Amino acid sequence: MEDERGRERGGDAAQQKTPRPECEESRPLSVEKKQRCRLDGKETDGSKFISSNGSDFSDPVYKEIAMTNGCINRMSKEELRAKLSEFKLETRGVKDVLKKRLKNYYKKQKLMLKESSAGDSYYDYICIIDFEATCEEGNPAEFLHEIIEFPVVLLNTHTLEIEDTFQQYVRPEVNAQLSEFCIGLTGITQDQVDRADAFPQVLKKVIEWMKSKELGTKYKYCILTDGSWDMSKFLSIQCRLSRLKHPAFAKKWINIRKSYGNFYKVPRSQTKLTIMLEKLGMDYDGRPHSGLDDSKNIARIAVRMLQDGCELRINEKILGGQLMSVSSSLPVEGAPAPQMPHSRK
């Protein structure tokens, strides 16, 4: 829940030869000379490829990838969809998304032939969390947001399937009475929160559920959110109100808005949940501002990004109460095994 009211794997690992279809389009290089565009990274006239900075790439495979990318850049949306369909890849999305998807497919195929992948690129599981919290119309600066819905969607990164879900409502204690605006926005009723446990009890249930999935022990995992606010604001405020330290497993996470913007090269204004879905050719499924439904839709975006070749990895953390970015140059790391945090003194 961000503070903005009004997000089949391509390629066959066993494939022995990278597909080398031709693009029918011809591009004039000069009045006398024309060059056919091929998706095998080679030029039909045998001329030497030079990188944009004037020097050769060190490995021929990167020349092939660059040539393929150039051809893809010149394809129409219909040609992109036809080529994606040929390889049984997802054909929905805006043109820039389709280009990125096809480029990553060819890149993965070519690099797979060059050398086998070394090491773990992905987490075994991603836990998608999108809190719903108490709110008032206009969100006054002094208002203390309390978590009233704690959902978790467990995404298996190997099968790209939602393996399980967790959902619990939470009883607020500072502002026990929900505003009409909050009820209308989230669909959560006063009766539902009145009958719910307080946050410490719900957090304990979440941790027990995560432990039952062997997260952080048998399986490498991390948290993923739609924006920074869920972990850096809502959970942080709630832990202070409940006199708990911030849970160690929730101190680092993937902000999918940041990952989406960086991967598809779009501005932050284009990374709201509904816009991300739209650009990927999907509709929102469920009730907006239901924490569980939001989390499921965020998971759908994560799946599509993984299919398109994005390496989702931790990119934000909270340290000393401050939100900080995590450099992509650091080694991939998972969240620690979930433990109930100690009480604050």
From Swiss-Prot:
UniProt: AMP binding residues: 132-133, 289
Biased composition (Basic and acidic residues): 1-11, 19-46
MF GO annotations: 3'-5' exonuclease activity; 3'-5'-RNA exonuclease activity; histone pre-mRNA stem-loop binding; metal ion binding; ribosome binding; rRNA binding
SAP domain location: 72-106
Tissue specificity annotation: Widely expressed with high levels in spleen, thymus and testis (at protein level).
Pfam family name, one: SAP
Domain Exonuclease: 126-302
Predominant place of localization: cytoplasm
Reported impact of residue 132 to G: No effect on binding to 5.8S rRNA
Cellular localisation: Cytoplasm; Nucleus; Nucleus, Nucleolus
GO biological process terms, semicolon-separated: regulatory ncRNA-mediated gene silencing; rRNA 3'-end processing
CDD domains, A to Z: ERI-1_3'hExo_like
Enzyme Commission designation: 3.1.13.1
Keyword Coiled coil attached: no
Knockout mutant characteristics: High neonatal mortality rate. Reduced body size in surviving mice which is observed as early as embryonic day 15.5 and remains significant in adults. Knockout mice show brachydactyly, platyspondyly, and no obvious changes in the epimetaphyseal regions of the long tubular bones.
Active-site annotation: 132, 289
Regulation: Although it can bind simultaneously with SLBP to the 3'-end of histone mRNA, the presence of SLBP prevents the exonuclease activity.
Cofactor note: Binds 2 magnesium ions per subunit.
Record has Phosphoprotein as a keyword: yes
Domain observations: The SAP domain is necessary for binding to the stem-loop structure of histone mRNAs and to form the ternary complex with SLBP, but not for 3'-end histone mRNA exonuclease activity.
Role this protein plays: RNA exonuclease that binds to the 3'-end of histone mRNAs and degrades them, suggesting that it plays an essential role in histone mRNA decay after replication. A 2' and 3'-hydroxyl groups at the last nucleotide of the histone 3'-end is required for efficient 3'-end histone mRNA exonuclease activity and degradation of RNA substrates. Also able to degrade the 3'-overhangs of short interfering RNAs (siRNAs) in vitro, suggesting a possible role as regulator of RNA interference (RNAi). Required for binding the 5'-ACCCA-3' sequence present in stem-loop structure. Able to bind other mRNAs.
Descriptive protein name: 3'-5' exoribonuclease 1
Species whose genome carries this gene: Mus musculus
Lineage: Eukaryota, Metazoa, Chordata, Craniata, Vertebrata
Gene that encodes the chain: Eri1
